Structures are given as structure tokens and as C-alpha cells.
């Protein structure tokens, strides 16, 4: 019986094995075909790809083919496999990819703006079991054919410290924006600007200026800037560390997208600008950064910041969210900080941020060393007893730094607002005094006006009143510089350079602009219907000037052939010399933005005959007479539609 069943069992076993092998071979062939199909489809239907080596499936260390632009003849919409691309979140006919040190990143083209976008490329990982602690490196991926889809803007951001507390903990990613150029010359490298924090729109104007824009996230609030006095705890300045890691990532991977590591600019706006200023002051000496852009920063970036501990508020927050009281220990509060942070690591981040917001807790970078006095560096060299406008002691050159403010921010700074104070206010004040002294006799320059009393106290200590003579600010009115609103003066640039500094300050003055208006205009869409033609010109000018600063380290000069600005300034002047605008400006404190003097246009509001008498008391009558002559001639030319560059000769002769 058993013998007769044995062949049957063996036969069934062989049949089962054969079927299994058959299915295995079938699935293997099917998967191989699917892989080849997708690979073929990926290469065939990618009309344009940014790639760094000839073999798309391997990562080679020898980057012989530099930024090759690959074109394929077949069209995307002719493919019956379009759905396959979409299943892989690839929905555009032009897909770009770059091989980084650890993976391949897929991007997409914005044809309207002629730029390639790579979104949410991870540069570090946040340890979700310890989100207040050190981040985790991004390790290499195998096989090399794996990729990450960076073609869609997922709006990734770190959790915010203000309502509605949007964002996630594992947020350490960056976006890359660049032009789809094709070069095989390794010397063809583009300057890089690392922009910290989120922006509402696109920084396409900087890309159009020939830059590679990298927008980097960093941890904020208690997760990024927990500050306490126990150096042994790891929970300090993680937001600063995140930025330093982003800089390291850029340096390590720049060669993959034709980035010039000798020209890297760190930039930010608002709170991010304060972080830029903090890094410049505390880490700039050892970072390979070329320049800095600080837009609308507040005083928390300054070097004289006091290290205020967040210990108590973290303990209070943890207890309010359910942490039981800890026993008394020798380390006291600092031990409680550790326990509180460990407890809050497992609490919903929105709850943590919401509770801290209700407690009015503030988190800012904590200095490496606390300095109880004002910093002695003002961006234009050290101020000494022997320092005058024509004789300054040369100090070590620093990396060029560009400060920008809107008009209202500047006013708030002048009048000592506790809400907004510029991070480098000393630079502005010192520049005012030094630049004014280049055109006026120091002993005869004095300020007497109720709206400028504080400015008198801060700036004018070196000037004395002579014969009871005063210069009225309303009579002095207001001077604007090249490209009115946003361009610093050439004389100011020359002065800062000869004194050993590279600090420039722009004031954005458009419609009594407030915090963030300059950034909104810079990132506005090219076809934004809410902007007038003039506003679009102004936005393009912002991008132009910032791009020039990143590329060269100094702002636009008349040698650049920036003649179109003359026509733009004409529109600005016509708009701001209307009677109703003058009334509004007079009602605003701090109506003078004294960034003097040279540029294509030095601008006065409408000048009455009575006020013109005041100009004769300003010490340099020929200068003002020539200026008014230019002002009148230029306005006639503008009304006649004359947009030539010839009229710039007036100012070149004046100054």
C-alpha cells in the first residue's frame, strides 16, 4: 500500500515544485520587464534632464560630464504609459534629476519662469524620539538607482511657534531652484544663495539673476532655540546647528549642480534674518560664507544679546501638560529642564507650541558667550577718538553684508520702538553722521525738530550748535538714493570700503511700506495682476540688486549701465511729489532717510519757495543749487517722455 503511494507523492511533489519554479520565473520576468519598461519610459519620455554623469543608473565619483542637458525626441503626451509616470508623482513632460552624494533627486521645470525646482531634499533627519536634540545624518541609499521625488512643492516647513502652529518635526529639508543651463565646463559655476526659512512665493527673480537659490528649513521655537545655562545638556541652539548642517550639505553637494562654493551667501528675512546676523557674528570666522543678506531683522541678532534662560518656562509647560513634579536634586532647575524636555519630546508639538505661546515665551539664539556691552564693530570700522569722515582707522575686512529695512521699520528703529529694532542699528546711525559730515561743516550741522529729538541724542553728539542756527528736518526734507527706495549710495559704499568694512544698508520705501512688503514684492509672480507696471519694475529691481550683491559683493553702480532705473525713478518721483503724499509723509515721524549721497537721483518732495530759503543755511550752497537744477531739469525731461541715460551726467558732475 505504502509502496504504491510513493510514486504518487513524488509526482505531486515534482509537479508542485515545477509550478512554484514556473511562477517564480514568471514573476521575475514580469518584474524585470516592468523595471525595464519604467527605465525606458523614464529616459524616453524625459524631454530634458539635468544629469551629472553619462550613466543614469550608477553614481560615479568622476564627474566628467558636467551638467549635461539631455534631449529626447519622443513627446510625453504620445505615450500610453503616462499613467505610470503619474503613479510615481511625475506629472510634467520635462523631468530633471541630479545625483547627490546619497541619492538621486527628481525635480520639475517651471516653463513660465525658465527654472528647475527640487523640493524637500532632506539634508538631516530629526530624531522623533528626541526632537529637541541633535539631528541625524542622512545616510547613503542603495542601490544607486533609487531616487526621491522632489518634483512637487509639498510646502514642507518646520512647526511654527505662532498660530496656527503649522508644520512638522522632521522638517530638515531644502529646496533648490536654478536655471536649466547646459555646460560641460567645470569652471562654469554659479553663485549660491542659501535662504533661511519659508517664503510665500518664488525667489525666481534671484534665479533669473544667475544664482542658484537654496531655501533651507530649520527648527524654530523651543525645538530650535532652547536656551539654558547648563552646557552639558544637548538642548541648545539646535536651529543654529541645523543651519550649519545645511551649509555643510551645500558645500558637499554643490559640485553636483554647478554651484560655486567660493561664492555662498547666507540670507533671510525677519526672524530668519536675525539668525543670519547671529551666525555672522558668532560663526562667521570659521564658515566658508562669502556674503550675508539681513532683511528686516530685529535686535535679537546683535552681539550684545543677553542669554536669558528658558528653563522655567519649559518646566512650567511640561507640568501644565501633565508631567508630575520631579524630586529635588542637586542640579535643581537644570535637572528639571532635562526631565521637562524629555517629557515634552513625546507630547504633540502643536500642544507644546500652543502652551508656550499662551505663556508668551520667546525663543531666540543664545550666544556662545554673553557680552554685556555693545559690540564695537559697526560695519564701517571701529569708532575711535581719531575717527572722522575723512580719516578712519582701517580694520580687518569682513565679508560684505547687506542690511535692508522697509520705511516703517526704519521709523520704528529711529524712535526706539521696543517692537522692532534693527539688528545693526549702530551701523545706520554711524553712517548718518559720517555721510552728513562729508557734505556739511561739522560745527554748523545741528538738528532741531520735535520729531527728531531722539535722533539728535543718538547721532549728533559730535556736532555743536553755532550762532543759534538749526536745520529743520522738514525743511531738509528727505533724500532718497539711486533707484530711489532700495539703492544705497555709491559714496556710502566707497566710504565703508575705505574704512575697512563692507556694510551696506537699503531702505525700501514704497507706499509707507511695512514689515514684509519688500519680500512680498520680491517673490511676487511675474504675471501678478494685483501689481501695477511700476510695482513689477520695482520688484524686478529688487531682484536685480540682490543678485548683483551676491555675485560681486557690492551694489549696483552707474558703471553697470543701470540706466533703466532713471525712468523708474521718474515714476517714483512723480508719484511721491504729489501734494497728498507730502502731507502723509509729514505726518509720519522720522520722515528723513538720510542715506546720502551719490546716485543717479537725490530726491526732494515738492519744495515751496519758503522752504527753499532753508537750503541756503546748509553749508554747501552750490551743491544744493546744482541738485535743485538737476531736479527741475529731470522732471521736465520725464514729462516729455525722455528716458535717455544722458541726464545721469548731472549727478556725476554734482558729486
Swiss-Prot record:
Asked if the Swiss-Prot or TrEMBL record annotates the protein with the keyword Lipid metabolism, the reply is: no
Annotated GO molecular function terms are:
carboxylesterase activity
Keyword terms of this UniProt record: Glycoprotein, Hydrolase, Membrane, Transmembrane, Transmembrane helix
Q: Name one GO cellular component term.
A: membrane
**Where mainly located?**
membrane
Domain of life the protein comes from: Viruses
Q: State its Enzyme Commission number(s).
A: 3.1.1.1
Q: Which Pfam families match?
A: COesterase
Gene3D superfamilies found in the cross-reference section: alpha/beta hydrolase
SUPFAM superfamilies recorded: alpha/beta-Hydrolases
Q: How does it sit in the membrane?
A: Single-pass membrane protein
Q: Family membership, please give it.
A: Belongs to the type-B carboxylesterase/lipase family.
What's the protein here called?
A: Putative esterase
- State the species of origin: Heliothis virescens ascovirus 3e
Amino acid at each position: 500500500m505504502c509502496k504504491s503511494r510513493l510514486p504518487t507523492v513524488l509526482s505531486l511533489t515534482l509537479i508542485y515544485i515545477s509550478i512554484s519554479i514556473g511562477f517564480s520565473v514568471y514573476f521575475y520576468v514580469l518584474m524585470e520587464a516592468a523595471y525595464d519598461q519604467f527605465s525606458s519610459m523614464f529616459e524616453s519620455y524625459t524631454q530634458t534632464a539635468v544629469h551629472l554623469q553619462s550613466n543614469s543608473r550608477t553614481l560615479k565619483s568622476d564627474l566628467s560630464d558636467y551638467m549635461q542637458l539631455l534631449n529626447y525626441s519622443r513627446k510625453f503626451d504620445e505615450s500610453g504609459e503616462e499613467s505610470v509616470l503619474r503613479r510615481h508623482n511625475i506629472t510634467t513632460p520635462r523631468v530633471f534629476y541630479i545625483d547627490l552624494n546619497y541619492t538621486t533627486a527628481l525635480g520639475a521645470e517651471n516653463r513660465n519662469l525658465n527654472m528647475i525646482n527640487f523640493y524637500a531634499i532632506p539634508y538631516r533627519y530629526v530624531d522623533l524620539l528626541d526632537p529637541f536634540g541633535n539631528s541625524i545624518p542622512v545616510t547613503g541609499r542603495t542601490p544607486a538607482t533609487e531616487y526621491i521625488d522632489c518634483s512637487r512643492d509639498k510646502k514642507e516647513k518646520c512647526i511654527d511657534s505662532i498660530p496656527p502652529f503649522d508644520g512638522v518635526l522632521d522638517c530638515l529639508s531644502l529646496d533648490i531652484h536654478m536655471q536649466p543651463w547646459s555646460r560641460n565646463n567645470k569652471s562654469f559655476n554659479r553663485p549660491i544663495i542659501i535662504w533661511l526659512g519659508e517664503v510665500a512665493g518664488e525667489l525666481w527673480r534671484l534665479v533669473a539673476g544667475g544664482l542658484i537659490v537654496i531655501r533651507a528649513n530649520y527648527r524654530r521655537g523651543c525645538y530650535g532655540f532652547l536656551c539654558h545655562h547648563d552646557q552639558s545638556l544637548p538642548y541648545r541652539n539646535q536651529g543654529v546647528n541645523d543651519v550649519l548642517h545645511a551649509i555643510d550639505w551645500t558645500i558637499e553637494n554643490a559640485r553636483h549642480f554647478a554651484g560655486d562654493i567660493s561664492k555662498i551667501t547666507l540670507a533671510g528675512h525677519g526672524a530668519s534674518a536675525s539668525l543670519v546676523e547671529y551666525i555672522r557674528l558668532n560663526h562667521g570666522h570659521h564658515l566658508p560664507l562669502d556674503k550675508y543678506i539681513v532683511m528686516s531683522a530685529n535686535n535679537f541678532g546683535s552681539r550684545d544679546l543677553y542669554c536669558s534662560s528658558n528653563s522655567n518656562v519649559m518646566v512650567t509647560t511640561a507640568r501644565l501638560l501633565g508631567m508630575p513634579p520631579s524630586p529635588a536634586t542637586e542640579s535643581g532647575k537644570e535637572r528639571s529642564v532635562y526631565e521637562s524636555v524629555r517629557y515634552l519630546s513625546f507630547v504633540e508639538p502643536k500642544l507644546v507650541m500652543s502652551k508656550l505661546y499662551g505663556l508668551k515665551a520667546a525663543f531666540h539664539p543664545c550666544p556662545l558667550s554673553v557680552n554685556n556691552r555693545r559690540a564695537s564693530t559697526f560695519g564701517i570700522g571701529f569708532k575711535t577718538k581719531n575717527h572722522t569722515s575723512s580719516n578712519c582707522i582701517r580694520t580687518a575686512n569682513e565679508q560684505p553684508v547687506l542690511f535692508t529695512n522697509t520705511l516703517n521699520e526704519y521709523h520704528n528703529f529711529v524712535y526706539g520702538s521696543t517692537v522692532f529694532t534693527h539688528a545693526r542699528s549702530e551701523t545706520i546711525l554711524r553712517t548718518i553722521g559720517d555721510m552728513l559730515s562729508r557734505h556739511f561743516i561739522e560745527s554748523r550741522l545741528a538738528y532741531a525738530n520735535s520729531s527728531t529729538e531722539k535722533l539728535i541724542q543718538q547721532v549728533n553728539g559730535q556736532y555743536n550748535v553755532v550762532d543759534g542756527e538749526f536745520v529743520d528736518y522738514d525743511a531738509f526734507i528727505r533724500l532718497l538714493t539711486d533707484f530711489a527706495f532700495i539703492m544705497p549710495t555709491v559714496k556710502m559704499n566707497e566710504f565703508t570700503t575705505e574704512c575697512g568694512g563692507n556694510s551696506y544698508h537699503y531702505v525700501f520705501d514704497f507706499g509707507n511700506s511695512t514689515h514684509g512688503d519688500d519680500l512680498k514684492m520680491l517673490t511676487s509672480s511675474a504675471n501678478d495682476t494685483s501689481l501695477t507696471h511700476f510695482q513689477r519694475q520695482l520688484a524686478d529691481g529688487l531682484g536685480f540688486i540682490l543678485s548683483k550683491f551676491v555675485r560681486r559683493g557690492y551694489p549696483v553702480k552707474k558703471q553697470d549701465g543701470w540706466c533703466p532705473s532713471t525712468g523708474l525713478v521718474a515714476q517714483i518721483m512723480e508719484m511721491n511729489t504729489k501734494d497728498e503724499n507730502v502731507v502723509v509723509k509729514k505726518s509720519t515721524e522720522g520722515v528723513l532717510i538720510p542715506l546720502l549721497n551719490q546716485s543717479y537721483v537725490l530726491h526732494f518732495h515738492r519744495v515751496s519757495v519758503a522752504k527753499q530759503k532753508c537750503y541756503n543755511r546748509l553749508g554747501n550752497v552750490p551743491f544744493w543749487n546744482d541738485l535743485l537744477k538737476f531736479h527741475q531739469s529731470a522732471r521736465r525731461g520725464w514729462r516729455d517722455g525722455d528716458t535717455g541715460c544722458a541726464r545721469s551726467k548731472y549727478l556725476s558732475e554734482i558729486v
